[in-house]
Amino acid sequence: MVREKVKVSTRTLQWKCVESRRDSKRLYYGRFILSPLMKGQADTIGIAMRRALLGEMEGTCITRAKSENIPHDYSNIVGIQESVHEILMNLQEIVLRSNLYGTCNALICVQGPGYITARDIILPPSVEIMDNTQHIATLTEPIDLCIGLQIERNRGYSLKMPNPFEDGSYPIDALFMPVQNANHSIHSYGTGNENQEILFLEIWTNGNLTPKEALHEASRNLINLFIPFLHVEEETFYLENNEDKVTLPLFPFHNRLVKLRKKKKELVFQYIFIDQLELPPRIYNCLKKSNIHTLLDLLNNSQEDLIKIEHFHIEDVKKILDILEKNRKFISN
């Protein structure tokens, strides 16, 4: 456990982790402060952060399981102590950590007798189990058991459908939220017009993210929500998708690309690969799958084109804009 004394700054707004501990493999705790704040600001930030921590965070869960010769999820299998329903409930409790984008498959294939734990799950390299000791099932006889799993990264929760899927797999209720609880409290100090506040944030996570990682991600999510308000109305366009309209800023580097074409210098972009831009793995993989390999490929796509890429979101476009802004040397005249 890490604990620090709280020192109040009288100048620049600062944040600090004042307590950090791991109570178990599936329970992390962090306590943070932000100060100095003017009266009322601590509550504004605290409420927004708590909602973002509990509702906007992405997590990774097992969402489907499939095995041969299972008539229904309340049946029992000879040689297995638990019912199918109990096995599905145990799989629901497995805590995973990943940089996965979308879904992937995993596998359990064991021979009894013996105990099956999370350690027996064969995972892709992008997924990690936080607690290998989590119990799944007990084989009481020398039988072979193979279970195919689907792993998904998402946010919020997903309630299983009452019936199995057409391929015979069984849905599993998924709670994607890595933050188990979040609280904020306020300490006021000073007098009269000089009254100021310290915001205390407490975060509990399941190990999918550490509290500090959760704080950073929630902050980024909040910033992304407010970005559209930083652009004047005339410099935006509307993307219509199934009756939903989304406002996005214009791609600021298109004009620069047009100027370079006039100077016949755009060919240099063919030799700047997106690998050099240090993109997040998920964005990088989506671009690669869409045959976007170079900076020229990227700049030749409008934001409308990018948003149509499978598994691509508005936040990803904004992240690309931020990265391009930081790499102006690649796009200079």
UniProtKB/Swiss-Prot annotation:
GO molecular function: DNA binding; DNA-directed RNA polymerase activity; protein dimerization activity
Annotated catalysed reactions: RNA(n) + a ribonucleoside 5'-triphosphate = RNA(n+1) + diphosphate
Keyword terms of this UniProt record: Chloroplast, DNA-directed RNA polymerase, Nucleotidyltransferase, Plastid, Transcription, Transferase
Renumbered residue ranges of the record's region Alpha N-terminal domain (alpha-NTD): 1-233
Coiled-coil ranges (or none): none
GO cellular-component term (any): chloroplast
EC number: 2.7.7.6
Gene3D superfamilies, alphabetized: 5' to 3' exonuclease, C-terminal subdomain (1.10.150.20), DNA-directed RNA polymerase, insert domain (2.170.120.12), RNA polymerase, RBP11-like subunit (3.30.1360.10)
An example Gene Ontology biological process: DNA-templated transcription
Primary residence: plastid
Top EC class, one word: transferase
UniProt-annotated location(s): Plastid, Chloroplast
Annotated spans, Alpha C-terminal domain (alpha-CTD): 267-333
Family matches, as Pfam families: RNA_pol_A_bac, RNA_pol_A_CTD, RNA_pol_L
Subunit structure: In plastids the minimal PEP RNA polymerase catalytic core is composed of four subunits: alpha, beta, beta', and beta''. When a (nuclear-encoded) sigma factor is associated with the core the holoenzyme is formed, which can initiate transcription.
Function of the molecule: DNA-dependent RNA polymerase catalyzes the transcription of DNA into RNA using the four ribonucleoside triphosphates as substrates.
Family note: Belongs to the RNA polymerase alpha chain family.
UniProt free text on domains: The N-terminal domain is essential for RNAP assembly and basal transcription, whereas the C-terminal domain is involved in interaction with transcriptional regulators and with upstream promoter elements.
Protein name: DNA-directed RNA polymerase subunit alpha
Species in which this protein is naturally found: Aethionema grandiflorum (Persian stone-cress)
